[in-house]
């Protein structure tokens, strides 16, 4: 993506997010439902959510844009403020603001973010959604979660809910997201910590509970669900993550086409 910096207006990350208008909550739900891919089965199940109402922390794994759609459907009718990276504000900052998103720069300490989170949870009493992996999963497994997450949860003193998606990565893998596959999608929404447990447990214990709840392996799930991916293009792009030849150990000489991945250094193409 070409960015014309002279035309780009600096975004004020210090300002507090707005409370998501009720009409936007409804519209987001309807649009998300209508935009779900035709012919793809999906299911959202809730566990240990009886009586759980905002405010609460919502933590989700992150595999592709469809995560946001499933999240909007799972949390409806409650208002949600999503923590979003600043690159998402490049084209339509007004829309991100209207949705109540909280702007965040990646891999930096941001005191304004803490202030915004407290504003959402304490003043507005809404849902605060974060994707702690901070990126799309490149290989379909859990990324390293920041230790600061437990401190933030401890400080908030609200329940913690985990939204765990399965199938989203297999449907549109990071390395070939332009060609979706016919894979069923399954999302679970689970309360993993009550407000009382957050107060009682240590930061280390909270981090471990969250880590366990957000652990996933898309390929293991595929095997367990007996899912076959038969699209003729299923290997295209795989060389972007499997960049080292397992035979000659040469790096960055892998290539892929159709349902095959091969090493150019060995002349396997």
Residue ranges and their predicted role:
Residues 33, 119, 212-216:
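A generic structural signal for well-ordered alpha-helical segments enriched in polar/charged residues
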Residues 21, 25, 36-209, 224-225, ...:
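Soluble catalytic domains of membrane acyltransferases
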Residues 218-228:
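Charged, glycine-interspersed solvent-exposed loop segments at helix/strand-loop junctions
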Residues 157, 215, 253:
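Hydrophobic/aromatic-lined pockets within catalytic cores
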Residues 8-30:
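Helix-enriched interaction subdomains in cytosolic or periplasmic regions
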Residues 1-5:
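Soluble, non-transmembrane catalytic domains of enzymes that act on hydrophobic metabolites at membranes
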Residues 230-269:
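Cys/His-rich short segments
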Residues 206-220:
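Short, structured interface segments
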């Amino acid at each position: 993506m070409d960015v014309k910096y002279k035309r780009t207006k600096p975004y004020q990350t210090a300002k507090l997010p707005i409370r998501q208008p009720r009409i936007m909550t409804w519209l987001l739900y309807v649009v998300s439902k209508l935009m779900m891919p035709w012919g793809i089965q999906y299911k959202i199940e809730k566990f240990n959510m009886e009586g759980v109402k905002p405010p609460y922390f919502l933590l989700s794994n992150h595999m592709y844009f469809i995560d946001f759609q499933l999240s909007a459907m799972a949390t409806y009718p409650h208002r949600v403020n999503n923590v979003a990276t600043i690159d998402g504000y490049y084209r339509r900052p007004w829309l991100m603001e209207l949705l109540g998103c909280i702007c965040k720069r990646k891999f930096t300490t941001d005191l304004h973010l803490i202030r915004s989170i407290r504003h959402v949870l304490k003043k507005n009493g809404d849902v605060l959604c974060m994707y702690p992996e901070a990126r799309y999963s490149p290989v379909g497994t859990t990324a390293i979660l920041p230790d600061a997450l437990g401190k933030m949860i401890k400080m908030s003193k609200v329940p913690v809910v985990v939204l765990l998606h399965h199938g989203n990565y297999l449907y549109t893998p990071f390395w070939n997201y332009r060609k979706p596959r016919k894979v069923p999608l399954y999302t679970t929404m689970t309360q993993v910590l009550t407000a009382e447990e957050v107060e009682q447990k240590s930061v280390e214990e909270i981090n471990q509970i969250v880590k366990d709840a957000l652990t996933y392996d898309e390929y293991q799930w595929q095997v367990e669900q007996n899912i076959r991916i038969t699209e003729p293009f299923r290997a295209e792009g795989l060389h972007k993550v499997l960049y080292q030849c397992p035979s000659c150990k040469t790096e960055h000489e892998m290539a892929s086409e159709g349902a095959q991945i091969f090493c150019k250094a060995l002349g396997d193409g």
